[in-house]
Amino acid sequence: MVLYKNKKKQIINYANSNWGQNEGVEFQETMLQCILEAVIVSKDAKQVLSLLHELKLFENFLWQRVNTEMSLNHINLTCMLLLYKSKYEYITWDLIDENRFQLFFEKVIEVSLSLNLSEVVYMIQFITLCFQFSNIEKLRKLVYQLTNISILNSLDNLDKVKYLLHDSSSLTKAFDSYKEKRPSIVEKFPLHNLLSRWIHSLLIKSISYAQTEKQEAKVTPLLAIINMSLVLLSAFPTRRFAHPVIEDSCFYTALRMSLYYDSNELFKKMTDDLNYVLKFPFDNTRGNEYEKEQKIRNDELVYYHLQLTLFSDFQKELGDLVFCTQTSLQQRQKLEEITSFLSFNSLKSLCSKCYLRTSFPEKYAIKVDFEFLKNVFINTYDRTRLVNDYDEIINFTLKDVLGERSVMDQENSLTNYFLLQNTAIQYLSISFFMRQQSKAYKKLLLRSLYAELLNFSEQYRRLSIKNATKNLTKDNFFSLNNFKVTSVAPPQIGQVLPQFVKCQMGLSRPGPFHSALRDLKNSIKSPFLCLIYISKDMEYKLLHGNALDPLEGVTDFTIATICNDDVGMFQSDMQSDSDNKSINVYLSPFYYHSLAGLGEYRPKQLKFNFALVLSPEANKYWLDLNILVSLLNRAKEFPKWFEDLFLGFGTPDICAFPNAGLNSIYARNLFNTVEQLQSVLPNCHVPSNLSTESLLIKFYTNQNKISADVTASDRHFLLPSNRLYTYNDKQLESILRGSQPGLTMVNGPTRCGKHVLVCKLLEVLQDTSPNDRTVVLSDSNFSMNTLFTLLEKARCFHQGHLLYLSDEGKDETLERYGTLSSWISKLPGLLREIGRLAASIQAPGSHDASPDTALYFRDAYIKRLWEKYLNTVDDKDSVDAYNRFPFHSYFGDKSKRPIETYNKDNFFDYATKLYGELEYMFQQLEEIRPFGLLRYYEDQELYALCQQSRIIGCTWTSLSTRLGTLKEKGFCFNNLIVMNSQNISESSITSILLSNCEPTGFDRLVLLGNQYLTSGNQDINNTSNGSLFKRLRYLKSRIIDLNTQYNVRESISSLCSSIYPLDIKTVDSSPNKRLDYGNSGFAHEVQFINVGAFKGSQETEPVSGYKQNLGEAEYAVALFQYMRMLGYPTNEIVICTLYESQVSLLNEIISVRCSHNSFFGQPAFVGTVEKLPSDKRVNFVIFTTVESKEASDHWNPKTFYKAFSACSYGLYVLCNRDLFRSTRGLEKLWNEIEKTPDKLLLTTGEIYPSSHKIGSSVETFEIENLLHLSNYVVEMTKKRLNTN
């Protein structure tokens, strides 16, 4: 820490001297050397790089001096800062000068060839970064020429190139074409020779480096080489040529690393990743997975190669063993026999000749020994283990958990390397992506399990000392009396694992355990348990604290699933006084199989003596992991157009309108005028005097232009379309494109009408394809509630075809439109109408008793009366049609407009509409009827999901718990609409798409998001599993940008536009024109307020990263109280901040000052900006920034944009205004900040909602400080009390 403080002071002095720009070259070089040493020596490189980023070393010095004479220190520091900025998205590639970047790129290539590997680590990482961002044009041109020339030239030097390429005609053609054109390329391109040696030279250097360097501090260069190789093996288009060049040398480098360093799990992870990429069965030119038959043929070739190698090179040592069959070579016993006859050198030679690709043991020997090579050889060719690799993903042992702990510990020693890495944005195949995400979730789960086991061990020790009893009880774990296996289902054909293992475990004093399971049942459908065994000889150590490791007492564990019936039993029998109760669980088949082995032994009694209820976080990881694994075998069921886009092949426009297909659509009340129609569809043919109420639009292409024939629609729709909203041109374009097959991406800020857009798109899809099923996905219930409120207002959707899967539970959603409970609750009202209808025609009997009797009444009476009416009415335009209508009595009482007021001469058309209402009522009864036959709510929901519903709205959380069951029951859909897609991970969307059982696949994918909002999804932030919206945007997919915000003040919109260059116009669509008036009691709608010191101090930081600002917290609560005194509703006010520690302080103050006072209440949200729901609509935001001395990483454009864009009418920022001048990305805010005073300015005589008109003169007064504001609020409260 002292070292960092000294270096920090020195770096700040350099910055104050303008980075020595007025000094000589020698001073500048010394300065760069000092700064570079500070980064390398520091234990937290991120902290130093963050300081350099804040001081603008890159912008003010390094980048300005990029030239051909740059020093090594200059190059390394530039690479470091580019890596840092890209990691934390502080860089805008479009703003970097292309010529200067090309000069720097070529200089890095040149220098990295001439220096040792240890000196060019950051240069290699910089080039790797360029590979990963090859979607950016200026990077793509440089990357393509480097990879194509370097890899193709390396292929020319390989003896085995013909053998490697003979199965791929496209690779052979590309290689031959390069050989022909190389002389002309060399002549025209001077850098050809430099680029052609680059990759091959680095790989050779890595092999040489691995053989000579033996210090752990030198491991980073090898890791950099392997990471670069992994990116080259996965990034399109480099992957089509990379394998033949990279695989041997790269794998050898990893092998040498693993042999030199003992027990390092990071090396095992790295070699396993590399092994997986190299061994994965796919066609390099396309990324398509091999068919099962082709995999079998390839497997046969592997054993043929082994058999040939043994016969040709090892006949002398093995004798008659070389004549064994390929089948016998796949047996472990035969492999053991072969290795026993080989010497160490012979076995080493055999492993080398066979190009082995396998995982390594967890502990690596210091030197290569015979047992190590023997294990490598046998594990490669042993085929007695028939467990599929995707099943092995969910196999957990205690060794895995402890191994992950080792990785966590050792990652800290390699912080510099891991902080500066990005993730590749392209994948080899769909299943490769699924496996990669499975590994990421497994990593998160293992870390969560480790934390829970650690917590359990500590609680166990404390309770044991306190209670001194065997029946230990805690809310999250419970002791077991016994644990026995009750039934084992035999394996399926071709498998070795049991289908399931059902066990019974006896609980001691099950009260708290029931409570924990009940809470867990409310959050997920299938609660999971961690079964633990603590041996007797370890209890003493744990009780007396003699264990060296807190987990030393836990000697075995596995994960089990509680049977659903038992969970229901828990909830109904929680108050039981029984001392013992047994419950059933499903044990992990992997664990049981490992106990039983390959023999006949099948244990009946197991040793587990504790059951640990997993936390909701661990349950979520386990559930998501199981979903990913269960969908691996469906990885080929994507439509071809989306598979190509997902993997990064071809032009993204191929997947969009009109290339993905053209459909005719029905559009009702979509366009306001014919002129708007012609502006959105400039090449359309519109007949004269066309009404836009109901249109049929037929699209076609004419000379590469999209044209359309627009005619009035004469189609009869069951429900009318109401014109509730008007749509701007961008919204109309989104609706028209979204109704066509393929991908549609819509980007826009908050309050730009995305919910209204989706509502209208659903109506168009319903009218155009009534039988299509659409899933609408979002990241929050708030977003879904908003959408279904709009659907209810539209009144053009049949409620029986809507389904809202809410996370709020059955009881809470009884009255919510679209939920199953709400739909079923309509039954009594419909039956009452049936009773009234039967009475109006004097039909005897209780026809309103049930849906069955009502449907019988329809067939026996209503249909016959209508058929009789049709047959007896001769002239449909006469009064006779009115006189003979059989339902006068019913509609005379029911209709808002008396039936007698209609024109009797033209009554038949109206009679048809009235009968249509009766048919619709019976249709609803017919669709509700099946739910009465299903006993359980879960079965009713499953029926609605898989059979009846046409529009399904849900969050990923609510759908993920049902996904496994839905896949088995044939859940299918045609369209997927994802709202707030920047917050939903790729694996979530992929899982939903793969669970689709529609034979033709899905037709449309519509992604709506806001590219400037940071994701609140921690799974996206913690893993490489980013959002699909963001990745497709990187791949240059076409995006429609919405540019109109509704009911947002122009001053707030200007703040957002000053952070990001948004061309946004604001529209006031409120009925009372609220934007014309200010906020009651405030002189300004937006104000940045200098709070200043409170009690002599500003923010405090007792622990690093734990910052609090008492003055700002008190000011924020006082401002909230002031607004409440004026009558502002609590649900319109939000208090947000940058630090979780400040949230605790705010909650504490609110609890004391507001919670128990009916005058105040609590704000709608108190929390960090990161946790603020991106779609939460609030009118007023109080934002406390905490820091007043210097800005930290929290002061970044995305965080402030999210806070500003969350409000509509009022924004009050508590801050130190001067910090905005010096914070990168926020400097442009200063022009907006200066427009308002630095002290809070209030008005008098205004009570919410009445207010002054903006621009008019109003009496104001200034709040001097926090004490002044607090006293003013106290006086207002006293007056209010006296008034009451």
Curated annotation (Swiss-Prot):
The keyword Protein biosynthesis does not apply. One of its GO terms (molecular function) is mRNA binding. It holds the Pfam family AAA_12. Keywords: mRNA processing, mRNA splicing, Nucleus. Disulfide bonds: none annotated. Belongs to the CWF11 family. This is Pre-mRNA-splicing factor cwf11. It comes from Schizosaccharomyces pombe (strain 972 / ATCC 24843) (Fission yeast).
